[in-house]
């Protein structure tokens, strides 16, 4: 079922998209988002996420980084969240000479 859903998306990516002048305002592109959503979440939820993404993609959309929920890149720690305060190399106490 997944491969059947991915077939028209792959056709679009390799046969149609390269001939189009416009580019997706999101990263990953809407077609790549659909592939990742279907592969990660399955046909039903992935198809729903892909459809919701396509509805968010329009000329007035802000665009930018919009990963598939639950993917590795989306769950990676943000800057500063992986630091343990006890592992700091800077001392907070001052020594007097």
Curated annotation (Swiss-Prot):
Residues 68-97 are annotated as: Disordered. Its main location: membrane. GO terms for cellular component: plasma membrane. Keywords: Cell inner membrane, Cell membrane, Membrane. It is found in: Cell inner membrane. It holds the Pfam family YidD. Residues 72-97 have a biased composition (Polar residues). It is a peripheral membrane protein. SMART domains: Haemolytic. HAMAP family: UPF0161_YidD (MF_00386). Could be involved in insertion of integral membrane proteins into the membrane. Belongs to the UPF0161 family. This is Putative membrane protein insertion efficiency factor. It comes from Marinobacter nauticus (strain ATCC 700491 / DSM 11845 / VT8). The lineage of its organism: Bacteria, Pseudomonadati, Pseudomonadota, Gammaproteobacteria, Pseudomonadales.
